[in-house]
Structures are given as C-alpha cells and as structure tokens.
C-alpha cells in the first residue's frame, strides 16, 4: 500500500513538473522551425526573391500563439537578422507584415529597438531599447 502511494505521488510530481515546464521547453526549441518559415522572407528582404512566397510562409507562424512563444519567435528573428546583417536596418524586411497585410506577426516581427522580453499577446508594436 505504501509503495502504491509513493508511486502515485512520484507520478503526480513528475506530471506537474512537465505541465509547468512545457511552455518554456516549447519556446526554447522553436528557432529551427521559425528560421525555416522565414527563409523566403529573408530572401525577399535581401532583394533576392518576390514577396508572395514570404507572405504565404507567414501564415505558418500561427503556432506562435502564447506570450512565451511570441517572445521566443522574436528572439529567433533577432538571430536571423544578426546572421544576415543586410536585414538590420532594411525597411523592406521590417515592413513585411504590413506589405503582406499580416497583422498576426506584427507584434513580434523584428524591427530596430524591439524588446522581445516585453512582448505580450495583446501588444501591437513595442519600440524600446535595441536588443542585439
């Protein structure tokens, strides 16, 4: 009987830890997916491709639907820009959400002076100190 109670308590504890940590674990592992999705947008931003494939790709970012995922996606985009310096002050890249008429990605799309750690689900645009 004691063994069953101990096993049940241990199982409950492990399940609780998994539930609590899952949003953070998921937000840490999204960069490969975000990078793959925005590849056509990088090509467009650098003047190497038309905008249509980028606009279609942005719809795949709908999985970024929690505060932690939006913040993580924002950090991924900062990484993309840091690896492609031609995008840093590039209005063509910054204006992709507007040009694609995509309001969903605007709050976490990269732009100068964005603070990824301050993004929430209801944010429109956040311009603060540069996060580079």
From Swiss-Prot:
SUPFAM superfamilies per record: Bifunctional inhibitor/lipid-transfer protein/seed storage 2S albumin
Gene3D superfamilies given in the database record: Plant lipid-transfer and hydrophobic proteins
Keyword annotations from UniProtKB, A to Z: Antibiotic, Antimicrobial, Disulfide bond, Fungicide, Plant defense, Signal
Pfam families, per the entry: Tryp_alpha_amyl (PF00234)
Highest taxon in the source lineage: Eukaryota
Signal sequence interval, chain numbering: 1-27
Keyword Disulfide bond annotated: yes
UniProt GO MF annotations: lipid binding
GO biological process terms on file: defense response to bacterium; defense response to fungus; killing of cells of another organism; lipid transport
Disulfide-bond pairs as recorded: 31-76, 41-54, 55-100, 74-116
Subunit structure: Monomer.
Protein family according to the UniProt entry: Belongs to the plant LTP family. Highly divergent.
Protein task: Antifungal and antibacterial activity against the Gram-positive bacteria B.megaterium and S.lutea.
Protein name in UniProt: Antimicrobial protein Ace-AMP1
